[in-house]
């Protein structure tokens, strides 16, 4: 279902999980779980926040769609959706329809062609996406200090020719 390998680039150790786009399933793990403590494998794909320390309702701040539907159920205190249907930070998304993978500028999942209501579709928005930018390595190197002590940085890379993620 996936292959794993490790590489080093500019002093940073990269742990790479490669799979077909059809295997991707964005999910909301809530506060009761985290990726390490779950039965899932993958990466943290988006930004989120919690409105109260004692509730289980994260506000998802990027597009996050699985099976053609937003993965969450949150709203903010202005009753605006924070369920993965819209991006409030970042304005690009990667999406897969079951046969086509693409990327585009979008802040609402309904704007992604072939995603809404499609049981085979997924979409993930993000803040620092360099979609279609030939200089993406330079952009990432400027954004990430490889000498910092931060752990857990994650990224999604897609190959539109092979539908590999």
Residue ranges: model-predicted function:
Residues 122-165:
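A mid-sequence, solvent-exposed acidic-amphipathic segment
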Residues 22, 27-28, 56, 107-110, ...:
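Polar/charged alpha-helical tracts
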Residues 1-86, 92-97:
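Zymogen propeptides
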Residues 20-23, 73-74, 108-109, 132-137, ...:
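A short linear-motif detector with a strong N-terminal bias
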Residues 42-45, 93, 102, 123, ...:
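Small-side-chain structural scaffolding
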Residues 86-139:
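Hydrophobic, well-structured mid-protein blocks that either form specific transmembrane helices
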Residues 56-67, 107-121, 143-144:
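Short, surface-exposed, charged loop/turn segments at secondary-structure junctions
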């Amino acid at each position: 279902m996936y292959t794993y390998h490790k590489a080093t680039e500019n002093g940073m150790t990269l742990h790479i999980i490669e799979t077909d786009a059809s295997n991707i399933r964005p999910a909301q793990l809530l506060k009761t779980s985290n990726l390490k403590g779950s039965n899932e494998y993958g990466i943290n794909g988006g930004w989120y926040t919690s409105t109260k320390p004692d509730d289980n309702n994260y506000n998802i701040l990027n597009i996050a769609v699985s099976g053609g539907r937003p993965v969450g159920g949150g709203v903010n205190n202005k009753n605006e959706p924070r369920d993965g249907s819209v991006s409030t930070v970042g304005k690009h998304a990667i999406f897969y329809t079951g046969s086509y993978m693409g990327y585009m500028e979008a802040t609402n999942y309904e704007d992604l062609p072939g995603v809404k209501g499609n049981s085979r579709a997924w979409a993930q928005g993000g803040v620092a996406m360099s979609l279609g930018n030939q200089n993406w390595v330079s952009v990432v190197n400027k954004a990430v200090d490889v000498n910092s002590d931060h752990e857990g940085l994650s990224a999604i890379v897609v190959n539109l020719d092979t539908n590999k993620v």
